[in-house]
Amino acid sequence: MIRQFSAGSSFTARHACEICRQRKVRCDRALPRCRRCERLNQACVYSPISQRRTRDEQLQELQERLAKTEAQLALDAPRGPASSMSSQSRSDSAAPAASRVPSVSASVPNSAATNPMDMVGTRSSNTSMDLPVNTSPMLDIDLFTAGADSNMALDWNPYLTALEPLDNLLPNRLSPRSLPQNGREEDISLAELNALHNYYFESVYFSFPFLNRDRFAGESTGNGPAINALIYSVALAGCTHSSPQHTKVSIYYTLARNYAEKCERDGQLNDLNFLQALLFIGRFEAMEGKVESSWMTLGRAAMLARLLRLPQMDRLEESTESQDGSGLSLLETTDPALLEERRRTFWALYILQSYIKTRTGWQCMLGDIKTFQINLPSPGLLRSDLTPLKMPFISEIGTEPCPEVSSYAGCVLMVDLALRCLDHAQGHGATNFWDGYCALVKNTDELFGMLKQHLNATSIRKDPVAFSLYLNLRATEIFSHESAIARSKEQGLPPLMTAESQRRATAAAFQISTAVRLNLPSPWKVDSDIIMLQAIFIAWPLAMALKAFYRELEHGGSRDSVNGVVTSSRLLFAALGHIEESGGHWHQSVAHVEAKLQELDEKNGFNSLAL
């Protein structure tokens, strides 16, 4: 963040100090000396800037620098064989605008989307998640070969530098911040509300697609606490990722919560809009680093989902009698699109609660997934004319023939696998540790095979869900191997017994850094930052990859191999710093990695990351 000097200063802004700029490391720009120079007892000098450049000038310079970097990479890096990855087709039209303003609408395509990448079926061209030049050799990167890219000689300094101005333009990070608890509807214009709804559905929606835009557009012209809660929570989701509207986040948050609480006070619980509003609110609180508040909000949503019997919504008719004594239920319907929306909403809740568990260890409140009798999400864009495929229960995967699996359904399968890995590492498994470990490694490989169509370089650059799916699958792989390494130490096994586990964990960490490199944000497409869109879902993979690299740094090796680990770690730290302030939860979890990088930098002259 470029900070302002006091009023008596001769200039208003400063770059990094001269030493940090020469060494190409991050500088905290503190006065009179930055933290790095103070620690190393070096002279810290800042060059004066006579006039702050405008944002347009900064972005223009970044465009030129990145274009030069891409051109240099194209010349220096030999292209591999032509990739066999097929590009996924995408529709160019969008669903109707969701707003309380009836006059605002958009065209609706007649045919239903059949693309399994359901969340990228529509998107306006100005929000595509693209690197500066689409012909980059990065598109040929191997994301599956074990050990691929394990000795990276690529200079990533231009990419790391490109993230710095984005940190100024994108204030939303995974860090606690106080939000004023006041908000009035009079402070929100209908035009602003409509613009945020449009922005959400055209950009943010594809990162977590569980709301039917057509239904929302129709019902948002009505009134009532449930639809009002959803209206303001959707605006909150759009506002969070939209820099111009970010100053009104607290107003939308307060209004969304107030209407959600009114639903409870008025007893209007059997409404899908209320449940979806709780999900939006809980996701926002998680992004703000308010884990306890998010857990409580999602806990309310979980209890509501159970009262509405969503976990058993697809069980056979003869067994649909309530066993919990709840008199609540959603309205009966045969509308396939509405039924699919209910399923996606439930699975969104399952994914969000599982994210909190990976951070806190708290148990999910939806019950045992083995008892769920609800179909997995179907491929296809969620809208009124969707005819969903008949999908199996999650317990039937591997035993029943399964239609094409969307990346959203893939996330559900990945979360189930990750939770089983967590339980196994904590000793909750039914089998002995090593049998369970081998079974989980096999399950991970099988899931990669099942979802491979979503896990290529093209898909993870276009589909935010596929991006987080890939990173979390790799992080789950690392977690399994790290738990095996830890258990072998406890049992006094020779290091040779875990050599393969360490090799695979390191390879997975390199593949995570490769995927992150593919999705470094374009400075001129700030609102299309796929890393920030998926912030709460990719922080854990970034941390797991850094921990795997730490083990490699401790082990040592040749200068080239260590330098590959260091440069990969620098990129991951830059991405983590992009989505979370230093000192945040995930930064604290990898503080030992940062210390190790600084130690290497000071002793050996590596360009390690200084935060």
Swiss-Prot record:
GO terms for biological process: DNA-templated transcription. The keyword Nucleus applies. Its main location: nucleus. It is found in: Nucleus. Residues 78-113 have a biased composition (Low complexity). Keywords: DNA-binding, Metal-binding, Nucleus, Transcription, Transcription regulation, Zinc. Gene3D superfamilies: Zn(2)-C6 fungal-type DNA-binding domain. Residues 17-44 bind DNA. Residues 76-125 are annotated as: Disordered. Pfam families: Fungal_trans, Zn_clus. One of its GO terms (cellular component) is nucleus. Disulfide bonds: none annotated. One of its GO terms (molecular function) is zinc ion binding. Transcription factor that positively regulates the expression of the gene cluster that mediates the biosynthesis of depudecin, a highly oxidized eleven-carbon linear polyketide that acts as a histone deacetylase (HDAC) inhibitor and makes a small contribution to pathogenesis. PANTHER family: TRANSCRIPTION FACTOR DOMAIN-CONTAINING PROTEIN-RELATED, ZN(II)2CYS6 TRANSCRIPTION FACTOR (EUROFUNG)-RELATED. This is Depudecin biosynthesis cluster-specific transcription activator DEP6. It comes from Fusarium langsethiae.
